[in-house]
Structures are given as C-alpha cells and as structure tokens.
Amino acid sequence: MIEPLLCGIVLGLVPITLLGLFVSAWNQYRRGSGMLDID
C-alpha cells in the first residue's frame, strides 16, 4: 500500500532528476568536446 502523496513525489522527482543529470552531462560534454569539430 503506497501512499498517493509519496508516489506523486517520487514520480515528480525522478524525471526532474534524470533531466538535470542529462543536462549537466550534455553541457560538460559540449564544453569539453565542442572545441574539436562539433559545431
């Protein structure tokens, strides 16, 4: 029996966390490799 509030919090935080990790990783990759020949 999962509480709806807890379930909602988890379902709300997981995509935000994944998006934040993806954005930070993409920015680091673009900053590090963007100077080669990736326009």
UniProtKB/Swiss-Prot annotation:
List the subcellular locations.
Answer: Cellular thylakoid membrane
Provide this UniProt record's keywords sorted from A to Z. Electron transport, Membrane, Photosynthesis, Thylakoid, Transmembrane, Transmembrane helix, Transport
Q: Where are the transmembrane segments?
A: 5-25
Q: Which GO terms describe its cellular component?
A: cytochrome b6f complex; plasma membrane-derived thylakoid membrane
The domain of life for this entry's organism is Bacteria
Membrane topology, as annotated: Single-pass membrane protein
Pfam families recorded: PetG (PF02529)
* Keyword Kinase assigned: no
Q: Main location per UniProt? A: membrane
Q: Which GO terms describe its molecular function?
A: electron transporter, transferring electrons within cytochrome b6/f complex of photosystem II activity
> Could you state one GO biological process linked to this protein?
photosynthesis
Protein's UniProt keywords contain Transmembrane: yes
Disulphide bridges:
none
Q: Which family does it belong to?
A: Belongs to the PetG family.
- Quaternary structure and partners: The 4 large subunits of the cytochrome b6-f complex are cytochrome b6, subunit IV (17 kDa polypeptide, PetD), cytochrome f and the Rieske protein, while the 4 small subunits are PetG, PetL, PetM and PetN. The complex functions as a dimer.
Give a short account of what the protein does. Component of the cytochrome b6-f complex, which mediates electron transfer between photosystem II (PSII) and photosystem I (PSI), cyclic electron flow around PSI, and state transitions. PetG is required for either the stability or assembly of the cytochrome b6-f complex.
Query: Which protein, by its recorded name, is this?
Result: Cytochrome b6-f complex subunit 5
Please report the organism this UniProt entry assigns to the protein.
Prochlorococcus marinus (strain MIT 9301)
- This protein's encoding gene: petG
